[in-house]
Amino acid sequence: MAWVPIKARLVSLAGDLVSLSITDVKRLLDKAGIAPKKSLGQNFVVDPNTVKKIVRLAQIKSNSRVVEIGPGLGSLTLALIDTGAEVSVVETDGALIPLLTEVLNGGARIVHADARTVDWQDLAPGKGWDLVANLPYNIATSLVIELLDEVPSVDRMLVMVQREAGERIAAKVGDSAYGAVSVRVALRAKATVVGSVPPSVFYPKPRVTSVLVAVERHKQMESSNEVTEEMIRLLRQSFGQRRKMLRKSLTGVTTPESFTLSGVKPSQRPEELDVKTWLRFAEANLKVRKS
């Protein structure tokens, strides 16, 4: 069968969002003589209903400015472009750039870079950016935290991640997945698991179930940089020994006065404290250390 350019076959009809089918993906990969890289977590979305769901949950509109991390071959990107939004994509795999360029046909800015090292001030200047990403398990939580800490221009995110990672990002006090990651995310944003994505919508099919996590940045920070850094220090030490009571896990870095001043009980364990309590504890510990 003769190759028909992707751009000649992808149109938006009756409100249906454009996307790449599994046939499109296989043909593009075969044409380039490449295969999905497991090391990069390359599982391409090939289900139009999933693409539509992601765009809807991300609340992308015609006046949105969107960064997509890990566009792959551009299936979701096409749907983002179709909304009329301004779209930039960051792809780390150089082998996909020519294919992505063909598929998108000038509809989005393509940046060949690693999202962990890209110049975000150039990529997403100012305020009010949305971010959509399909993140590999090994970088998902660290990248979400890095974006919240260091890229204030991104107001909202919708990330597709392995279920276990998504549960950690969005966990609240009392949830089994609640940990240091949950606290650090809650410091700067509200995170909610808003959907599940089965393996069947990807090519190739992963062995895990993914979830969609919506992350909306708080309008104001609740602490100074100094208190935040102290909280992170306490989180790392306490959650590294999460089954121990705080008076044991934080021996040498806190004092009885820190507990008294903050109202935190020495017998509590780290997963019992929400982000506001952690901030109060960190602030008290700093005050005692300086006195």
Residue ranges, per PLM feature:
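An accessory alpha-helical subdomain
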Residues: 208-217, 223-257, 265, 270-276
